[in-house]
Amino acid sequence: MPNWCENNLHIQGPEELIKEFINTVQDENDGEKFELASTLMPMPEILQGGEAPARDEDVAQEAIAQTGHRDWYDWANDDNNWGTKWGDCDTNLWWNDESTKINGYYTTAWGPLSEAFWIKVSETYPKLRISVGFREEGMAFEGAYSFTNGECVYSHSAETSPYLQEAVEAVDRFADEETVYEEDMLIPTYSGNHASSSE
């Protein structure tokens, strides 16, 4: 089971392109469901529904010949494709009919959708300004990307606050122990700093 990365999406652009984008990612049978990865960069058909790792060597070799990948898992995790196991999950988008903006939220496995994915989307919709913010608390990192005209114009990622990193490390240290003693826990303060309880 992966750590879930939380993602916020903000898109701005001409009203007609906003509508086109929504129509592309909106489920045609359920207007309240959206999929970004599988609609904006579809997985090659030969890999869809297959096993990972690929057990049939003939199928794997044909997949490699067509896609450069032996199974769906390798393709999806490649940073030149989605960069994450399942694409986006639990995707919600908000806009109105005369809108020039879309706001959204979705989750991804282990990390955000790749920069290469968003560059491809930006090449398809060059007049849209696309910004993505992400945070994965399990591994304590966060960041943001911005794209326009088929280019990444801003990219930054870093560890989150030192307190969060130390908290993650403390949890990791004690994850296998039966009892965690209070003196070993990190106690947050409202100032954003941290302190451990009595030494």
List PLM regions with ranges.
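Intrinsic low-complexity, intrinsically disordered or marginally ordered coil/linker segments
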Residues: 1-199
